[in-house]
């Protein structure tokens, strides 16, 4: 988006930094009656804080995450001040904001059949479309791996309980496969905000 906008709801107030957000992610927030405040990629921490959000969500989007300098700065400024959730490129932005690094993958993850392993051993078939990844070993102390890719071992999700940051590399609004199913990322997010 080029200008901030709001999608009203009576639930938790969620600030969203739009890096190219997919409609199903907005629908996932709306399905939980969130009061959604969407901001463009170049928003500042002060602008986000002005809407008094319960949490910040960094969306998916195309391209090299190091180019999202304003979003990286915003996340860096807000880390530890409110819960932050990231998906897809949003995870990469959060990783960079914490001082981690990203790299261009030899073979990007594209399609609705990418298997990821949860830290407890469970497997999800996910939908993904990215050519960059966060280097797991570049993340600072306090970060823990939540998901890894079954095929290549790349990082698919991380969290930092001290800064209240949770991120996934896949599209959490849809599970891969022949029918629409949502991965419990947003349910977990709203349960933690309650």
Model feature map: region roles:
Residues 1-46, 50-51, 65, 173-178, ...:
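RNA-binding accessory domains that recognize and position tRNA/RNA substrates
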Residues 9-14, 120-123, 160-165:
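Beta-strand-turn-beta hairpins that frame and shape the catalytic cleft
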Residues 13-18, 126-127, 166-170:
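Active-site-proximal beta-strand elements of phosphoester/diester hydrolases
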Residues 32, 51, 80-81, 141-142, ...:
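Structured helix-beta-strand junction loops
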Residues 122-162:
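Catalytic beta-strand/loop cores that center a nucleophilic Ser/Cys/Thr
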């Amino acid at each position: 988006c080029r200008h901030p906008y709001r999608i009203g709801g009576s639930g938790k107030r969620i600030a969203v930094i739009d890096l190219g957000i997919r409609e199903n992610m907005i629908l996932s927030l709306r399905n939980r009656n969130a009061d959604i405040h969407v901001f463009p990629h170049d928003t500042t921490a002060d602008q986000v804080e002005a809407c008094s959000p319960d949490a910040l969500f960094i969306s998916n989007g195309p391209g090299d995450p190091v180019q999202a300098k304003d979003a990286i700065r915003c996340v860096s400024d807000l880390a530890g001040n409110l819960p932050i959730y990231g998906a897809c490129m949003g995870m990469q932005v959060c990783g960079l904001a914490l001082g981690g690094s990203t790299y261009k993958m030899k073979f990007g993850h594209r399609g609705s059949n990418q298997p990821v392993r949860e830290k407890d051993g469970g497997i999800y078939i996910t939908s993904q479309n990215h050519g960059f990844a966060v280097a797991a070993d570049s993340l600072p102390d306090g970060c823990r791996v939540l998901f890894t890719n079954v095929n290549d071992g790349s990082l698919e999700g991380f969290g930092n309980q001290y800064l209240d940051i949770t991120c996934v590399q896949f599209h959490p609004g849809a599970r891969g496969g022949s029918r629409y199913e949502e991965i419990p990322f947003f349910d977990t997010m709203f349960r933690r905000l309650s």
